Amino acid sequence: MTDRNEFLNDINKIVIKIGTSSLTKQNCDSTKENCSIDPTFIENIAAQVSELRKLGKEVIVVSSGAIGVGLYELGIAPKPREIPIRQAAAAVGQSILMQYWSEAFSKHGIKVAQILLTYEFYSDRVSYLNLRNSISTLLEYGVVPIINENDCTCTNEIEAIFGDNDKLSAMVASKIDADLLIILSDIDGLFDKNPKIHEDARLISLVEKITPEIESYGGDPTSFKGVGGMRTKIKAAKICSMAGCYVLIANSEIEDVLLKVLSGKEIGTLFLAERHIQKNRARWIILSRASGTIRVDAGAKAAVLGKNSLLSAGVVDVEGNFDRGDVVRLECEGRVFAKGITDYTSEELMKIKGAHTDEIEGILGYNNYSNVIKKENIGIMEN
């Protein structure tokens, strides 16, 4: 058994992600699907956060639950398919959610601040950079930021983007250089097989590196109230790993779970971080929404992983429509291994794919860039 204190002794900045199922578990109707906020749970979390702050820890909370609470309050049947209804529910539920958080923390003399984000926010470089400053300022003033996705105004299908805020919490943790992301849900951690089906399923206490085998353990979502299954939590761990941030997945039903985790108790699954931390710009590129895909050959992949630029000779195919300056995925043999900011449009790349640099001008009539993607504009997603 691994000594958790070996990894968690120097933890100072913590992001706590709380899933919908945890927030509403004890306050459901007879169907077990239509649920409202469990105030006792929120009060317990606030009390634990207060204790962590007394120990000098900085804490940010990422809270799901707005849509579910809104549906309950409006008397709407669970899981409506219509986006406008879900957005309306989110608007109602978010205000109620914040009221509970504010009241719970006020009992400990702590103020809270609401921050609502969308994925598009991360694709804008200026907004992305400003997030760090905003959160840092709130922490300096002793405020606990409460973050959620802006479900009411997001232009994409709700919950298809962040995965019940698993990805959102990881992106926040990555951006603010958090030391630890704690994901609380209704599951005990990562198992080598589905524990609801297999009695011999084994809880994996420590993940040193996220391998394809580890990813295969993700399976399908396990919680019927949230949308964030284990697969999205593993993806969240991958995002945090490249930023040097640990991830701990634990069951929210454990009494004083946050305090026990930080005291080194063997709870849930701990994902370690990469030793090589991606630079801030590379992290932004990786976290940005891709406008398309550039498929490359094995030689080009090796060159990119070796911290070299992508040349047109290594381009095999192009998918999607994108312009110069857009973020695109780099794919080889069906696997995305990097993202980058392209210097050529998809239309141009279709014409020059496979061509050597000195042939570009003859094909296009001009040669504005010798590289398809400069090395400083690439974020590596696998080593």
UniProtKB/Swiss-Prot annotation:
The keyword Transferase applies. Keywords: Amino-acid biosynthesis, ATP-binding, Cytoplasm, Kinase, Nucleotide-binding, Proline biosynthesis, Transferase. Residues 291-367 form the PUA domain. Pathway: Amino-acid biosynthesis; L-proline biosynthesis; L-glutamate 5-semialdehyde from L-glutamate: step 1/2. Pfam families: AA_kinase, PUA. Substrate binds at residues 64, 151, 165. Its main location: cytoplasm. ATP binds at residues 17, 185-186. It is an enzyme of class 2 (transferase). PROSITE patterns: GLUTAMATE_5_KINASE (PS00902), PUA (PS50890). It catalyses: L-glutamate + ATP = L-glutamyl 5-phosphate + ADP. Transmembrane segments: none annotated. It comes from the Archaea. One of its GO terms (molecular function) is ATP binding. NCBIfam families: proB. Belongs to the glutamate 5-kinase family. This is Glutamate 5-kinase. It comes from Methanosarcina barkeri (strain Fusaro / DSM 804). The lineage of its organism: Archaea, Methanobacteriati, Methanobacteriota, Stenosarchaea group, Methanomicrobia.
